[in-house]
């Protein structure tokens, strides 16, 4: 069995939330359960990752309610610091997770081809482009994002149900609450849409 790292940068940084995609459960704050993977074994490992692509929020409505969800842009930058958590899962599990994120069945991925191209659109779903981010401990790192680059679609602030899940994930990466707020306030889709005091109240009451 071949394994790859799946790098998450949105709600899947929260390990409890990501396990719903593996095991077929409903995440707290979500309106519907996930289908789950054919192989429900937990990740072999997980660890933080710094992704050098910009994080932003877009789209209008999802299982998290009205509001945007997280994507990364297509242009790498040394000064871009998107926090993430990556999970060591099988290639089959990665394909199953990507299928669920795109609302389809049976997405087939040629991982070698993606390594060559770095960005490869495979479906018209919200997360239809698979991205190769490099290697760690001899295994390739992949994630997925929109087929559209940052700025090609309008920025939309996310729901607090969604942001709470992201905040929990950021806290597990070692951020304190002020660091979580400072991090999120810089991101397109939050910057200029949600003020700091409202963000604090929405996340923690």
List each model region and its residues.
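Glycine-aromatic micro-motifs
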Residues: 1-205
């Amino acid at each position: 069995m071949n394994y790859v790292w799946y790098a998450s940068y949105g709600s899947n940084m929260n390990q409890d939330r990501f396990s719903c995609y593996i095991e077929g459960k409903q995440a707290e704050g979500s309106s519907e359960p996930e289908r789950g993977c054919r192989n429900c074994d937990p990740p072999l490992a997980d660890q933080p990752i710094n992704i050098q692509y910009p994080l932003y929020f877009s789209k209008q409505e999802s299982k998290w309610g009205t509001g945007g969800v997280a994507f990364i842009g297509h242009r790498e930058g040394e000064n871009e610091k998107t926090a993430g958590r990556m999970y060591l899962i099988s290639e089959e599990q990665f394909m199953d997770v990507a299928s669920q994120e795109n609302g389809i069945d049976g997405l087939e991925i040629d991982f070698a081809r993606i390594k060559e191209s770095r960005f490869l659109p495979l479906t018209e779903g919200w997360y239809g482009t698979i991205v190769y981010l490099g290697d760690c401990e001899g295994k390739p790192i992949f994630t997925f994002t929109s087929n559209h680059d940052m700025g090609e679609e309008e920025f939309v602030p996310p729901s607090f149900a969604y942001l709470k899940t992201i905040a929990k994930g950021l806290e597990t990466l070692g951020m304190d609450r002020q660091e979580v707020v400072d991090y999120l306030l810089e991101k397109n889709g939050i910057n200029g849409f949600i003020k700091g005091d409202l963000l604090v109240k929405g996340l923690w009451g």
